[in-house]
């Protein structure tokens, strides 16, 4: 997600400084872009203070989405956010601190009604719990720092691998169904999220607010896979994974990687996530406050994403 945002900022004429961990030798998708690099660590406040010195805006997009322990999630999502806010709170030039949270911080909708910002946060995974805790940290520092919090739903697009596995199944002619087939989703195309981040950052109206940002349309997982199958020219066969089977596979996957430093892609919490019926939210408040309108339909976004996956040899 960060690389899409960096590209948009450069297109708009901003000078961009990216914080890169000391332990990371490569720059990933931004390695060929005209940016300034600041080496540092989210666990070293002095390095964060040096990296953010003199900046007008801080966009905190990094986070831990997969980990093997509560400590790793907490350090990557809560402690990192606290340290960054501690580092920037006395910067006299700072106009906005934009924190990218997640729909996971609010949890799924229980009755199918898209969640709004005043819905109580009931996260169901450790990732969601720690993103909600990080939002609380933002609220505490919001007394001294101009902050906006964005909660995107599932994000897809070029460079993103979160939906890659499902699209690989579709490409093989298989349409997986997890639990109930009437699963409903809010989605957002990655470059559109970058545009929303910039809108939220530059608007004075957004300071002190939390927003869901998404495509206003709600899709079923079946509909999403059928659109992908049509683009790929595939006929698909539905294969159902009952809840008990998905949990069994997840448990075996966790056990198999228990001695590895690599977290399982499908673990028990991810299975719980996949089995929820309604991962939906309403972006109406964000639209009302900023005028932001999603400009990329699901079919357009999937077409571009699938084309990119093929070009990269991912599909």
Q: Can you say where each PLM-predicted feature lies in the sequence?
A:
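NAD(P)H-binding glycine-rich loop region in Rossmannoid oxidoreductase-like domains
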Residues: 35-76, 106-108
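Mid/C-terminal beta-alpha module of Rossmann-like enzyme folds, strongest
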Residues: 199-266, 283, 299, 303-306, ...
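Substrate-positioning beta->alpha
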Residues: 129, 133, 160-165, 178-201, ...
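N-terminal Rossmann-fold NAD(P) dinucleotide-binding loop
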Residues: 2-3
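N-terminal Rossmann-fold cofactor-binding loop
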Residues: 19-24, 42
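Conserved Rossmann-fold NAD(P)-dependent oxidoreductase catalytic core, especially the SDR/UDP-sugar
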Residues: 79-126, 148
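Glycine-rich NAD(P)-binding loop of the Rossmann-fold in SDR/ketoreductase-type enzymes
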Residues: 43, 72-83, 125, 129-130, ...
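Catalytic helix-loop patch of NAD(P)-dependent Rossmann-fold dehydrogenases
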Residues: 110-155, 175-179
């Amino acid at each position: 997600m960060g690389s899409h945002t960096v590209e948009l900022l450069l297109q708009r004429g901003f000078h961009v400084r990216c914080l890169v961990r000391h332990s990371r030798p490569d720059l990933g998708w931004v390695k060929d872009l005209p940016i300034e690099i600041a080496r540092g660590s989210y666990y070293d406040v002095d390095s964060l203070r040096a990296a953010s010195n003199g900046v007008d805006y801080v966009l905190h997009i990094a986070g831990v989405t997969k980990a093997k322990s509560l400590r790793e999630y907490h350090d990557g999502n809560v402690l990192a956010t606290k340290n960054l806010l501690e580092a920037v709170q006395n910067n006299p030039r700072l106009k906005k601190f934009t924190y990218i949270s997640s729909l996971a911080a609010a949890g799924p909708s229980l009755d199918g009604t898209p969640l709004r910002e005043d819905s109580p946060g009931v996260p169901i995974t450790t990732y969601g719990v720690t993103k909600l805790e990080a939002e609380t940290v933002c609220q505490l520092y919001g007394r001294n720092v101009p902050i906006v919090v964005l909660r995107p739903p599932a994000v897809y697009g070029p460079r993103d691998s979160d939906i890659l596995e499902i699209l690989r199944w579709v490409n093989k002619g298989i349409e997986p169904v997890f639990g109930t087939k009437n699963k409903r989703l809010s989605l957002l195309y990655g470059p559109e999220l970058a545009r929303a981040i910039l809108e939220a950052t530059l608007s004075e109206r957004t300071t002190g607010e939390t927003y869901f940002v998404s495509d206003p349309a709600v899709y079923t997982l079946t509909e999403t896979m059928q659109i992908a199958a049509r683009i790929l020219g595939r006929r698909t066969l539905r294969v159902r994974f009952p809840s008990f089977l998905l949990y069994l596979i997840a448990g075996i996957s966790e056990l198999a990687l228990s001695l590895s430093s690599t977290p399982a892609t499908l673990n028990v919490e991810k299975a719980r996530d996949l089995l929820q019926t309604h991962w939906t939210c309403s972006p109406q408040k964000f639209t009302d406050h900023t005028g932001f309108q999603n400009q990329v339909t699901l079919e357009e976004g999937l077409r571009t994403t699938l084309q990119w996956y093929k070009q990269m040899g991912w599909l």
